[in-house]
């Protein structure tokens, strides 16, 4: 699966992920900025909302 991958300081690049899920991590509270994207599905917490998705490619735009 092709996923977007970046952190707050890097530009988004497309990465070919071994697993078939991508995630998009953002702040739960305003300002709701996106903090990163990547492969897999890490857990969120009280401050971080993690949206995971599988297929199609680039689903974590």
Swiss-Prot record:
It is found in: Secreted. Interferes with neuromuscular transmission by inhibiting the enzyme acetylcholinesterase (AChE) present at the neuromuscular junction. It selectively binds and inhibits with a 1:1 stoichiometry the mammalian and electric fish AChE at picomolar concentrations. It is highly specific for the peripheral site of AChE and blocks the entry of acetylcholine into the active site of the enzyme (through the Met-33 residue), thereby preventing its breakdown. It has been called fasciculin since after injection into mice it causes severe, generalized and long-lasting (5-7 hours) fasciculations. SUPFAM superfamilies: Snake toxin-like (SSF57302). Changing residue 11 to Q: 6-fold increase in inhibition potency. Changing residue 11 to K: 1.7-fold decrease in affinity for TcAChE. 1.9-fold increase in affinity for TcAChE. 3.9-fold decrease in affinity for TcAChE. It comes from Dendroaspis angusticeps (Eastern green mamba). This is Fasciculin-2. Changing residue 31 to R: 625-fold decrease in inhibition potency. Transmembrane segments: none annotated. Expressed by the venom gland. GO terms for cellular component: extracellular region. Changing residue 45 to K: No significant difference in inhibition potency. Changing residue 25 to L: No significant difference in inhibition potency. Keywords: Disulfide bond, Secreted, Toxin.
